[in-house]
Amino acid sequence: TTDSATGMLWMTDKLEDLEASDFVQYQKAIEAGVPAVMMGNVICQSVTGEETTPCSTSAGAVNYMRTTMGFNGLLITDDLSDASLNKVCTQDEAAVAAVKAGMSMLYVSTGFESSYNAVLSAVNSGEIPAEKLDDAVGRILTTKGI
C-alpha cells in the first residue's frame, strides 16, 4: 500500500508471510554470500516493530537482518534524499537515525554535506556512539578485503 499523503510504501504483510515469499530471494542471496543489501524506504511494521519507521532507518530491521537472516555484510540505506521519505523526516534526521540503527553505509544522492554534518554533530554529542561507526567501517573494510 502507498500512503497518499507521503508517497511512502507500507507493507502490511505478516512476517511469516514475508518469510515464505518476498524474503526467500534475500535469504538465498545471503546464503550465496552477497556482500551488501540495500534497505528500502518502506515501512514494514512486522520487520521493524515500529509503526512509522522505514526499514532504511530502523534498528529493528537491522536486527532482523543480522540475527534472523544471519547477514553480516554491508547494510546500505535506500536514498535518504527520496522525496517520500523526506515528507516523514528530514534527510538529516534520516541520516542520523540510519547510523544509530546500525546501517553500514548511507545513500544520499543530494545534500550530502548537510547529512554528513548532521551525523558528525550526532557523533560529537554522543547521540551516536563511536562503536556504531567502528562497526560500519569494519564491515566496509572486510568487504573490500582490507
Enumerate the language-model features and the residues they cover:
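Short amphipathic alpha-helical coiled-coil/interface segments
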Residues: V137-K144
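Second-shell residues forming the walls of enzyme active-site clefts
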Residues: T1-S121, E127-E131, R139
